[in-house]
Amino acid sequence: MAPSNIVVQSSSTPPVAGGDEEFAPSVWGDFFVTYATPVSQASEQRMSERAELLKAQVRQAFDAASMDVAGLITYVDTLERLGLDNHFRDLIGAALERIGAEELPEHGGGLHIVALRFRLLRQHGIWVSTDVFDAFREDAGGFCSSLCSDDPRGLLSLYNAAHMAVPGEVVLDDAIAFARGRLLDIISKGEVRSPVSEQITRALDIPLPRFTRRLETMHYIAEYEHEEAHDGLLLELARLNFVLVRALHLRELKDLSLWWRELYNTVKLPYARDRMVEIYFWTCGMLHEEEYSLARMFFAKTFGMVSLMDDTFDVHATLDECHKLKEAMQRWDESEVSILPEYLRLLYIKTLSNFKEFEEILEPNKKYRMAYTKEAYKLCSKNYLKEAIWSNQKYQPSFKEHEELSIMTSGLPMLTILTLMGFGDEATPEAFEWVSSVPEMVRAGSQVTRFLNDLSSYKLGKNKKDMPGSVETYMVENGLTGDEAAAAIAALLENRWRILNQTRMEIDHTLLPAAQVVLNMARANEIIYLHGRDAYTFGADLKDLVTTLFLKQVLPL
């Protein structure tokens, strides 16, 4: 089943990057270098003190034993959507145990609560059967219109819950089709009020389990006060927390913008994309919590460097130069810089020096992680070279060949390792071994990334030097039109999301931090490639979202 947000029709007038064309310059320039945050240090201190007081009050109010199960389900969901769950993980864990152990009463408070419970448990890796939806289905197997159609919130919850499907769950295929059709009808007729109308529109673009957490929090804070039974304590804490986390993000973005300006101006590769603000937006979509600051910095810096390398292989270097760049990366030694053409030497030196700085930052007991990160980066250059060879030789790979290579060139395996390098002790040596082995979950996350990217390339047009993508290889191999092949790739994309859901529930708890990075990276890609756009390459497509996330005033405190 094709995901609802994918547009598979090709554009009649595609913008083309590559060859003699250049990527558009950054839409931000040095804006975040000079931007002065409206929150003073004194104000931030006062807000932090107030937030700590409110957290204590929430802990006192969060009495899982005294709440009924339906109320507990709603409370946990509210904490998560308001972006507060990282402050109450222990309480949420205990609450989920009770939610999973206790059955809801008959009809369980309606479709909304039944579906919400299903989604929450599955998102936390707790298996729950689709049998819970039997009460809302007819004898023939379809969903009962009389029970569901007059309940927009319930339909929305069903639609979101059904996107936690694993392969082969036909009941949830039916649920998606049923709920989507009715939600579209409701929106077109204007039959639902705010804020549910906005939540439906958002989910029809990207279902909640695939939507980035930070963006959902941004939207939900504005919507929550319009809920009939909203909790003023949670709302105040959520607003404070959002502003405090944003202040940290803006400091990080300023530091990264300064770092990137120095790097980009030093290496002098004008053919490469200048996209640090977009990279950082991507980063916050993956990990926004305060405790992951170092991981964000590692991710963003590495993403920037690998983007320079990727664009060199893709749109500028000759095949001979590609071979030399790959060989230099394998040797990983500044004394080998002479094998490179002059224009690539500074890129090579700066890459190695930045990795040295990464290692210096790591605590002694975490320096073992550098071996994994270097090997991942080296492997990335090998695979970029293979793509360059295919492109130069105009080789038409089989779909299987393309899929295997693109799992690695998606960047997800390498970037997962680089992100984990900035984690605390929860990222174990076993986690690095697991990601490095490219298990099924990492493969699925990489394929989500690649298929989204390739559907975008099909719609927008490819770089002149690009090798055939997933759509083109599938089209040639199966004798299909381009749009037919794109629809098939969209269906494969949906299947890979279901594999992600399944492997998340099966994984050993010691690997959960790494698994969550993989999931979050796939989520972040959904917003970058929404409706077939490529908001990384074409940064103007992301400008409004960046403005809203980092600059728009949160509702008055």
From Swiss-Prot:
Q: Which GO terms describe its molecular function?
A: magnesium ion binding; terpene synthase activity
Positions contributing to Mg(2+) 1 binding: D310, D314
* Residues binding Mg(2+) 3: N453, S457
Q: Name one GO cellular component term.
A: cytoplasm
InterPro entries assigned to the protein according to its UniProt record, in alphabetical order: Isoprenoid_synthase_dom_sf, Terpene_cyclase-like_1_C, Terpene_cyclase_plant_C1, Terpene_synth_N, Terpene_synth_N_sf, Terpene_synthase-like, Terpene_synthase_metal-bd, Terpenoid_cyclase/PrenylTrfase
Keyword match Mitochondrion = no
Q: What induces it?
A: Induced by fungal pathogen infection (e.g. F.verticillioide).
Which family is it part of? Belongs to the terpene synthase family.
Domain comment (free text): The Asp-Asp-Xaa-Xaa-Asp/Glu (DDXXD/E) motif is important for the catalytic activity, presumably through binding to Mg(2+).
PANTHER family for this protein: EUDESMANEDIOL SYNTHASE, OS04G0344100 PROTEIN-RELATED
According to the record's subunit comment, the protein's assembly and interactions are: Monomer.
The name on file for this protein is Eudesmanediol synthase
From the UniProt record, report the name of the gene that encodes this protein: EDS
